[in-house]
A protein has these predicted regions:
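Residue-level signal for pocket-adjacent positions within structured domains
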Residues: 11, 47, 75, 85, ...
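Conserved core segment of the aminotransferase class I/II
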Residues: 93, 97-176, 180-185, 191
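A Trp-anchored, charged/polar loop motif used as the substrate-binding/catalytic surface
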Residues: 24-26, 183-186
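Histidine-centered beta-alpha loop that forms part of the nucleotide-sugar donor binding/catalytic region
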Residues: 1-3, 21, 76-77, 107
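Active-site phosphate-binding strand-loop segment of PLP-dependent enzymes
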Residues: 11-88
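Substrate-binding/gating loop at the entrance of the active-site cleft, primarily
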Residues: 1-13
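Short, well-ordered coil/turn elements that cap or connect secondary structure elements
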Residues: 11-13, 33, 66, 95-98, ...
């Protein structure tokens, strides 16, 4: 990236504010002391599976708006949310339209791995230094990307049909049962999971 040089001593890049997600903090990063211009959050998180409550996510939205930062919110695993206090989108938080970009993928919820279909939400209300980020994104995307193939678009459309929603629900339940089996097996083998 364009953040700075790689520091071999601490194995970090200069110009990046690292936000540790550790077992001791529930795999949820704390608000940084330094002021970032860009914040990346992924919830539910991969690989930890940690999910953020709406109240905690609201703290991040408020922090970003207060400090003029933009949140890149990766919601690829939102279909796996089972808790009621966990938002499925950052836009469930007040003020998120002025500070957040949300990424979605069909790979995780619909099994489209390798098909390469997803979408990005860049609200028109998101403006930095007098520039609407939506307009920049639309221009960049319009000149660099020719769109997903028609058959892939139709498959994505089917995901939102009543039949597609039912099939996705079954698929996610199947994956969750598999995860539960692995979890129980690791616990029985003496691992801390």
């Amino acid at each position: 990236g364009r953040t700075g040089e790689y520091n071999k001593k601490n194995e970090n890049f200069d110009g990046v504010i690292y936000m540790p997600c550790l077992e001791s903090n529930g795999f949820l990063p704390e608000l940084p002391v330094e002021t970032p211009d860009l914040i990346y959050l992924c919830f539910p998180n991969n690989p930890s599976g940690a999910a953020i409550t709406k109240d905690k996510l609201q703290e991040w939205v408020d922090y970003a708006n207060k400090n003029g930062a933009v949140i890149i919110y990766d919601a690829a695993y939102e279909a796996y949310i089972t808790e009621e206090d966990v938002p499925h989108s950052i836009y469930e938080c007040e003020g998120a339209r002025t500070c957040a970009i949300e990424l979605r993928s069909f790979s995780k919820n619909a099994g489209f791995t390798g098909v390469r279909l997803g979408f990005t939400v860049v609200p028109k209300d998101l403006v930095r230094e007098g520039v609407a980020l939506h307009d920049l994104w639309a221009r960049r995307h319009g000149t660099k990307f020719n769109g997903a193939p028609y058959i892939v678009q139709r498959a994505g459309e089917a995901v939102y049909s009543p039949e597609g929603k039912a099939q996705l629900k079954e698929q996610v339940a199947y994956y969750m049962r598999n995860a539960h089996t692995i979890y129980n097996g690791l616990k029985e083998a003496g691992y801390s999971v």
